[in-house]
Amino acid sequence: MSNKLAQLRKLTTVVADTGEIDAIKKYQPEDATTNPSLILKAAQIAEYAPLIDQAIAYAKTQSNDKAQQVQDTCDMLAVNIGKEILKTIPGRISTEVDARLSYDMERSVAKARQLVKMYNDAGISNDRILIKLASTWEGIRAAEILEKEGINCNLTLLFSFAQARACAEAGVFLISPFVGRIMDWYKAKEGRDFAASEDPGVLSVTKIYNYYKEHGYKTVVMGASFRNIGEILELAGCDRLTIAPSLLAELEAAEGELVAKLVDSKGSKARPAPMTHSEFLWEHNLDAMAVEKLAEGIRNFAVDQGKLEAMIAAKL
């Protein structure tokens, strides 16, 4: 019998949640995802120094203003890392829009277009890129605009069912519901551990997946933010799962039969009318965990973006 990672690949598209090329080469995922925290981590690896130098050189041709140079360097660095990753995978790279734009639809759209142009100028076509946006109302509306322009989006920091519904109704390409961070909140709140089958994050993704399939939504469900392989195994059969290298290693070492837990019902239930802005805000607000985790996630990504900018500024 093959290991559980090999079995999982037959049920689910496996994505690597890392910006580290060596890990991607080792596990050969279909796609890869990055975020500001992973870009910051990757930028501190010696082999990436030339990518930083090239990004700085590019930025200096774009502006004489140091603050603008920092912004342009960070954007080009994310694209440079994405380009390197794309050399080793057959599918798509997810590159994230600055988290500080999470509540600004117009600037999110502009930043997304800029990142895509950088990829396009390097010979990378749109069908190999996903633009990551936080699943705020503004982020979802930005994605709706971008999707109509042929720019596929990955809506991240998704914690509530309201966020999931709004994303499907906006026709976004893919969502990344966070499993582990949901579990973290309930573990802290209730002071107990959860069996994988009862894990609140697992239950959240299962509910979203089943709702999408029952109503015929095409939006891809990609579970993210895992704390252990138990959560991953309970979501076998999900459209995609983005997994950190350490957990990919555990899956590769695990033996035993793996069965699909999520199965596409291919339903055709009538869809409800799309949520209004006020309905979205109210439904999301009713989920205390989601309110806290969305805000925290945006803040934390913004902190790491700031650290990356400080690192770049010191090199200019």
UniProtKB/Swiss-Prot annotation:
Entries under InterPro entries matching the protein: Aldolase_TIM, TAL/FSA, Transaldolase_1, Transaldolase_AS
Domain of life according to the entry: Bacteria
Any one biological process term the GO annotation gives: pentose-phosphate shunt
Family matches, as HAMAP family: Transaldolase_1
Pathways involved: Carbohydrate degradation; pentose phosphate pathway; D-glyceraldehyde 3-phosphate and beta-D-fructose 6-phosphate from D-ribose 5-phosphate and D-xylulose 5-phosphate (non-oxidative stage): step 2/3
Reaction equations catalysed: D-sedoheptulose 7-phosphate + D-glyceraldehyde 3-phosphate = D-erythrose 4-phosphate + beta-D-fructose 6-phosphate
Enzyme nomenclature, EC number: 2.2.1.2
Any single GO CC term annotated in Swiss-Prot or TrEMBL for this entry: cytosol
Pfam families: TAL_FSA
Family membership: Belongs to the transaldolase family. Type 1 subfamily.
UniProt keyword list: Cytoplasm, Pentose shunt, Schiff base, Transferase
Active site: K132 (schiff-base intermediate with substrate)
Protein name, as recorded: Transaldolase
Keyword match Cytoplasm: yes
Record-annotated disulphide pairs: none
UniProt cross-references to PANTHER family, sorted A to Z: TRANSALDOLASE
Stated role: Transaldolase is important for the balance of metabolites in the pentose-phosphate pathway.
